[in-house]
A protein has these predicted regions:
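Short, small-residue-biased leader/transition segments that mark boundaries at the very start
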Residues: 1-5
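Conserved AAA+ ATPase small/helical "lid" subdomain
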Residues: 240-283
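AAA+ P-loop NTPase catalytic core and its hallmark functional loops
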Residues: 19-252
Length: 283
């Protein structure tokens, strides 16, 4: 670990303790509260020590407003990312896909890049495109390029909204080659800490099936529907002083809506945990 400390400018034991405290204590407490296996926590600590964050992207490393709740899904995700895999989170609305993405970027201590896919997304939006600066043609780096450069976590939101020919440029980035070839520019090798996490919903307008070649480059995790403990965990983060009976009643309301939406009795538009939190704040 000496080289890591040296790069951070840490020269003695006292400074090393401060380094670990500032970068790790809060994350470790969250993981222990979730009862994550100590072996995984130890490997995460080593990951933090191994890869420092460049100064110009440190503002992208931040604790999310809502943290994910769910030991099994968290352990699966952490283990896969530690092995160097990319994740594809599939599930219905309000299952915590984006919350999990943000939580994983935070607990790994990596800069987060959010990439929202849509029907008009193309390779230039992802990798970058030529631009004219000071009478010179230069590359305007896209979010995928920046993830590769700085060891970021790329959140590929609603990846099944984009056309297959647009996301095909990611094949070499997502598989064992871990590189980006840009015509007219140098080949970029991915930083060893770079990971990508895709999210997708089925059945929404504009969505499509992902081709097998792309899906095979991810570890796919099917997100379960939220239960009472999960909803209460989210509500307690927003309302730590709220009455237990009131929070439990709101959680029950959300779960009732979830059941009705699942059976097609009501529209899934009403199934919105963010909306529930906003409604509680307004009361």
């Amino acid at each position: 670990l000496g080289d890591v400390y040296k790069r951070q400018g840490i020269t003695n034991c006292k400074e090393r303790k401060i380094f670990m405290k500032n970068n790790w204590t809060e994350i470790e407490k969250y993981l222990e509260d979730q009862k994550i296996a100590q072996e995984l926590i130890g490997e995460l600590r080593d990951f933090h020590m191994r890869y420092e964050v460049e100064n110009q992207v440190k503002e992208r490393v931040e604790k999310p407003d809502i943290l994910f709740y769910g030991k099994k899904i968290l352990e699966m995700s952490i283990a896969a990312l530690l092995q160097g895999d990319n994740l594809l989170l599939s599930g219905a609305k309000a299952t915590g896909k984006n919350v999990l993405c943000e939580t994983l970027a935070w607990i790994f201590g990596r800069p987060e890049y959010d990439i929202s896919f849509h029907v008009n997304t193309d390779s230039a939006d992802l990798i970058g495109t030529d631009t004219f600066i000071n009478n010179e043609v230069r590359l305007r780096k896209g979010p995928i390029y920046q993830c590769a450069e700085f060891g970021g976590f790329g959140i590929l939101d609603e990846i099944n909204m984009a056309k297959n020919d647009a996301v095909s440029v990611l094949h070499a980035t997502l598989d064992h080659r871990r590189r980006i070839d840009i015509p007219g520019y140098n080949r970029i090798l991915l930083h060893p800490a770079t990971r990508f996490i895709g999210t997708m919903n089925y059945g929404y307008a504009g969505t499509r099936e992902l081709n097998e070649a792309l899906v095979s480059r991810f570890m796919v995790i099917d997100m379960p529907e939220m239960d009472e403990d999960s909803v209460l965990f989210v509500l307690r983060q927003h309302f730590p002083d709220g009455e237990k009976s009131a929070l439990k009643a709101f959680a029950g309301l959300f779960l009732d809506l979830q059941i009705k939406a699942y059976h097609g009795e009501i529209s899934t538009k009403s199934l919105d945990l963010r909306g529930l939190v906003s409604a509680v704040k307004a009361t």
